[in-house]
């Protein structure tokens, strides 16, 4: 990608409207000082003393953080949190982010706030040591009245959208934001607006999804097509191309250290290698950075390869940020690409 092309694409970000619908969660980091370890007088069990607590939006919020870091002008968030303390923290964090519209993000007593609580042992001079995570989730189906709000919000917000991102983060179907009813609404939107990028990613794979843009890994691609995960790049390109033509929508397949493959319904396929790794890494959040950068770039009119190059640069920047779920800004991308 030339410097002029990079500037042309990223220069359009402030004018973009991106809709982000999905499972927003609260990432809460508990920083523990191992030197302050005590023993409980009452139970005799070890006590870990938390010296700092920091919280940030996770799940779909990680995609949001990356869109904000890119300088996307307006981001419409659609989702829910619980009417609880974690929900208050999450809403407060969302409202502080530049360009983020939260009027369609609701707190409801019918749901708990999806929370990842991550205890970290802080060792001087070395990366944090992550202990067992504590999760808070919903286990019952999302109520119909909440689904109705989500579908109505999607229809309203997408009118002026340049791109829509949908993230299904929950392990149990229909307990989060992207229920079967919401997936149907996304399919209807994509059919009605063939020029609009609707990019979907799901923790459980994209089987049963309507014809929208897909972002997945090789194992998910193989499973979706009823076979094994393709191992050769040419096979990934072939299968991604077949799926893109079948759905009439773009397909992106992440390949970890081997980069990413993208395919368009027109038959165009590309492979962009990953950038080199430098020292310790943490892959958490890399996939969300890829989603954000693909959507922003394609929404801004980027060609397939340019969008994928930006996504790979973002992923490389994010994995080198330890002890947090990182982001990548436009100046950082420019430096990473050597422009």
Feature annotation, model-predicted:
Residues 15-18, 26-166, 332-339:
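Conserved N-terminal subdomain of the carbohydrate kinase-like
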Residues 19-21, 133, 162-167, 199, ...:
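Structural motif
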